[in-house]
């Protein structure tokens, strides 16, 4: 007989209570129709001596996991674009999972015309998530992002230069689950003297990333658990998002930030895990 720990016992009990709450009329309405539309703007300052003085004050915006489909419409996407432009980011980063299911989604031709309205003077970058490869979506996603003015980082590096020749580097890895990530081949080029950011959809790859001189890893995939229980945390965590679920973590010299994303998948609810757009302000220190 399998031994059940106290934590697992409590988790099962709380899951049952949460299920009862969500299936009640009030809980169901809140988790399905209210919280999923409460977009939280989280703002953080990134401090490092490696951040050039000329980059001081620059704003980097991360958004993730839209999962366009039944629970996230083009109208929702338009509102997100307006909210992004309202904060005037310098660099915009999308960390994967644009469309929930490419095989069933019928509005694919209209996505780029909305996404391309995102304004960022120092460029827009994107990486693949697992849903972007799934459902034969690989080529569709590439086309949409390029038409939207995003540079797709596929096991590659992009250096952001300013006129004084100062720079930071942004690396992008292919999706770990369904893509062809080349971690060593990509990150071995990271320089110790440069502030290095890596975009990778799945956060739990962070221990491998920490072996390289990467300062910041930005990920999504987890949805912050999408449904959380007080004192016990997330109860819905996908593969490679079980150790690092939301917010900041430190792994050796690496700082990891996991964005909760904006959409929903698998279940139509968000509870205690509001959709998130993150703004990082760079600070030389």
What do the predicted segments below correspond to?
Residues 57-67, 167-175, 197-200, 255-260:
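Active-site-proximal beta-strand elements of phosphoester/diester hydrolases
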Residues 1-20:
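N-terminal secretory signal peptides and thylakoid transit peptides that target proteins
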Residues 58-141:
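Membrane-embedded segments
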Residues 42-45, 110-182, 188, 244:
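Extended active-site neighborhood of metal-dependent phosphoesterases/phosphodiesterases
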Residues 63-64, 92-96, 124-129, 153, ...:
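Active-site neighborhood of phospho(di)ester-bond hydrolases with catalytic His/Asp-centered motifs
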Residues 23-59, 71-75, 79-82:
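C-terminal segment of N-terminal export signals and the immediately downstream linker at the start
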Residues 48-60, 158-170, 250-255:
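Beta-strand-turn-beta hairpins that frame and shape the catalytic cleft
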Residues 203-279:
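Conserved beta-sheet core of the metallophosphoesterase superfamily
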């Amino acid at each position: 007989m399998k031994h059940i720990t106290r934590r697992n016992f409590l988790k099962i009990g709380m899951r049952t209570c949460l299920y009862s709450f969500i299936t009640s009329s009030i809980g169901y309405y809140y988790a399905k129709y209210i919280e999923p539309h409460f977009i939280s703007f989280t703002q953080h300052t990134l401090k490092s001596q490696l951040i050039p003085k000329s980059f001081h004050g620059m704003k980097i915006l991360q958004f993730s996991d839209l999962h366009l489909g039944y629970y996230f419409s083009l109208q929702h996407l338009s509102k997100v674009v307006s909210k992004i432009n309202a904060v005037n980011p310098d660099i915009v980063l999308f960390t994967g999972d644009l469309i929930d299911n490419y095989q069933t989604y019928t509005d694919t031709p209209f996505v780029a015309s909305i996404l391309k309205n995102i304004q960022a003077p120092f460029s827009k970058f994107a990486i693949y998530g697992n849903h972007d490869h799934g459902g034969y979506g690989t080529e569709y996603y590439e086309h949409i992002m390029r038409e939207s003015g995003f540079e797709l980082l596929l096991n590659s590096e992009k250096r952001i230069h300013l006129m004084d020749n100062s720079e930071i580097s942004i690396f992008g890895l292919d999706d770990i689950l369904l893509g062809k990530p080349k971690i060593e081949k990509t990150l071995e080029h990271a320089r110790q003297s440069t502030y290095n950011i890596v975009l990778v959809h799945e956060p739990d790859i962070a221990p491998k990333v920490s072996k390289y001189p990467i300062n910041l890893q930005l990920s999504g995939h987890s949805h912050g658990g999408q449904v959380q229980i007080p004192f016990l945390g997330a109860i819905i965590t996908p593969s490679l998002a079980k150790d690092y679920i939301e917010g900041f973590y430190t792994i050796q010299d690496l700082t990891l930030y996991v964005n909760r994303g904006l959409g929903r998948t698998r279940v139509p609810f968000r509870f205690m895990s509001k959709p998130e757009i993150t703004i990082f302000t760079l600070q030389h220190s």
